[in-house]
Amino acid sequence: MVILTPAEELGLSGLSLDSRLRKAFYGMPAERVTEIAARLNAEAKALDMCYWRDGSADTIHILMRPIGVMPDQLAYLNYVSLTILNALKRIPDLYLQDFAVRGIVPLTPPEEKWLWDTWTPSHRETNPVLGRLDAVVEFTSPMWKDSLRFMEPNLCGVGGMHLGPACERLLADVVMPAVQEVDPELQMEPGQDFREIFIQEVLDHLQAIGRAGQNIAFIEPKYSNQGTDEQEPLAQYYRERHGLTVVHADPSELRIAGGEVMYEDCRIDVAYRDYEVRDLIHLEEQQGVDVEPLRMLFRQNRMISSMAGDFDHKSCWELLTDQEMTQKYFTAEERQIFRRHILWTRVLSDRRTMLPDGEPGDLLKFVGEHHDMLVLKPNRSYGGDRVIIGYATDKAEWDREIEQALADSEPWVVQRG
């Protein structure tokens, strides 16, 4: 007799749930599926779930079949994610005190000046970071915990704040009633509404820094007409649901008056940004935008994410998978989480380092010989830009990509796939 661990039993429960969902969809008449798809599309359009391209809005397509997650699985994901996020929040202080850290997560000189000018003891006490950690996991596997792998952090201007909760609500309101027509006993509910989690974090942060007001600014390239359109629907949600004053601003629309940051006639108490600091520097240097209001918000710890958000380099994972660094800066419990769930990642360069097997070795030699298990990525790019998947390339092409990455003025990372 084989005795399963609780985690294995939970994974098999996830498999059973997934099987019931599949069976329910197989049992639906084709016309019912077509009806659901049409309604999802109409509801998504009504909720401004759009992606803008060159001034034209495309409604985002929602996949109908939900992914089922057991409560204990969700709790474990939260535990691991918060452990990693809290470690990442400490990187600005590590950067300021350790030159080795600066080599792994380098800032440009103007970015570093922003850090020195705006990072204060207040940030060490309460450090607001809104992040998304990109990961893969197989909930239906008996070994589902071991399948959880974090690929990279996104700690500034993350997408999905409006789209995620809206999508879950549509699945609950449109799809699940149809599923229960086939399987009445199958009960599923949406996860916690991220919009509510976020606004509570904002209000808690205002209280922690002693700021009495609750006027919030969402700051993004307001007039770009490119990408997702989330901040205005999100602002409208908070106005209607919570009665909060929430404004939607472009950086050029902020000013300082009487020692306060203002948008039109509204005093700003806290701001959420969809800009990296290097983008703000570009606005100042290339377009002449006055970014002093934003610098003030950073300095007074009234910007979400703090400067910690600008350390969401893919090379962060080297800090968390290098034994020398983790022994120096992180607890045994944190190190265990990192070893189990974070993909081995290194800044690509000609050096010796700890390899995935735990032994020191020549990095470039290892990368050249093991392309079938590795991925190359620009360190600070996003959106799948120039990601090279080793097993999808031949050896000659892989070697060319390595040479080009080493010659690039911007750092690249290599990661175990």
Locations of the language-model features?
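Preference for protein termini
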Residues: 1-417
